[in-house]
Amino acid sequence: MSNSKSSKKPVVVYGASGYTGRLVCEYLREYNIPFVAAGRNVNKLESAMKSNVAGIETASYEVVEVLHTTEALTHLFKGASVVLNTVGPFAKFGTEVVEACLAAKCHYTDTTGEQDWLITLDQEYGARFAAAGLLLSPGLAQMYTTGEIAAQLCLDTPGLDTLDIAVFWGGSPTIA
C-alpha cells in the first residue's frame, strides 16, 4: 500500500476493486500487461484481486491505495502510459483523474456512459490533451463500442455513405 510512489507499470486501473475494474485487470493479466490496481482502500483492492481476478498470481501487478486528489493521483500516475478510470459517477469523481493524467503526461480512458461527462471532456480538456500529444478517450463502455466500430467500418468501406444504428437497453437509469 502506498500513495507516495510513482507507477513503474504501463497501465493504472483506477477503481480496480469494482466490477469493471476487476474485469479490466483480468484482461490485462491474460495479455501479460503489467498494471497497477489502484483505489481508495487497499484491503478491498487486495481482496478483489485475489478473489475475483482469475489467475492473478501470474500477473505482474501492484496494489496501491491512493487518495482521490489531483496531487496524489498525479504522483501515482507518473511513469505510467495510460490510466483506465472506472470510478463513477464520472461527472462527480472524474475531474481529479483527468487533471492528474495531464499533469503526469499519460493517456486517459474511462468507461463512462454519461453524456454530460463526454461533452465536458471534449470542451474543457480535448485541446489540452491534443496539445500534449495525449489520448483522451472516454466512453469505452460496450454501449458505445459497437457504434464506434460500425462507424469505422462504414468510413473504411467505399460506397457506404449511411449508417443506421439502434441500441436497445433494458434496466433502470443510473442515479448519480
For the regions a protein language model found, what residue spans apply to each?
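A short, basic/flexible loop-to-alpha-helix module at the beginning of a structural domain
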Residues: M1-K8
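NAD(P)H-binding glycine-rich loop region in Rossmannoid oxidoreductase-like domains
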Residues: P34, N43-T120
